[in-house]
Amino acid sequence: MRPVKLSAAATVDLTKEYFEKNDILLIPTIVVIDDKEYWDDYENITPRFLYDTMKEGKLPTTSSNPIMSYYEHWKKYVDEGYDIVHMDLSSGLSGTYNNAVMAAKMIEDEVGEKRVYVPDTLAASCGEALILDAANDLKNEGKSASEIHYWIVENRLRANHWFTLSDFSHLFRGGRVSRTKMILGSALNIYPIMRMDVEGKLVQKKNTRGSKKAFKTLVDIMEQRADGGKDYNKKVFITHSDYLEGAEEVEKLIKKKFKNAESIEIHDLHQIGVHTGPGTVSIFFWGEERID
């Protein structure tokens, strides 16, 4: 059995230190500002830079990673004898997954056998991080690339993603809400509760009014869906887009209710924050499978 090299796009919203500590290959992702491409590797651009840019009235966008970017990052490890398992943003949110699949096929055609596995995570942000972290545990247990790939496909829908946000304008810009909903949402202090569906797409579940109600709703949903309910003993990730105080408030609620959680980590949103805009808070945990 060949050794396994894990690979993940920067959309997982972890840290450079995490990748270095666990010897995981980080694939930078592209953010476009004023027609200039920036490669986000957690150093070239920062969340602070992104959100300050938005406050200046500029509208950053994202772009799918080129096929050759994946190929060039992976080929040297394949040549060194590794099999690779790569985790990327859901195919339901971006075309970058398809580019990764094509790069893997290029390598397969070149070397004559499958060496790069690209499961569709159907995840985003720290939902990807949950899966990556589990894959790293499996690698350390000595599992093969094909076994890790199989586990991800079988368990990916258990990675729960729940979001809320305070600003509808970026959802309107992305075509996810109508102009009427944007205006009413802002006027009525609506905080939508959103989640990932079975196709790995971001969908709205319900509306709440005010941040306190929204944060409580997120934690109540976690109690209903998390493995073990209040006895949940696995990792929890919280992300935010320029809304640290909101993330810390959710962290307090989770600590109060889930006293056995293995760890609770807060991270900045990178690429997903480009689409949701400032004011987003999200939670990620292992729990019941998404069914719709």
Placement of each model-derived feature along the sequence:
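Mixed-charge interfacial surface used for oligomerization/domain docking
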Residues: 2-5, 11-25, 30, 96, ...
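N-terminal glycine-rich anion-binding loop in soluble enzyme alpha/beta folds
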Residues: 5-64, 69
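Positions that flank functional sites
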Residues: 34, 92, 200
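A short glycine/small-residue-enriched secondary-structure motif
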Residues: 45-51, 74, 79, 106
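Glycine-rich phosphate- or other oxyanion-binding loops that anchor nucleotides, phosphorylated ligands
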Residues: 55-93, 98, 102, 149
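Short beta-strand->loop
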Residues: 88-90, 119-122
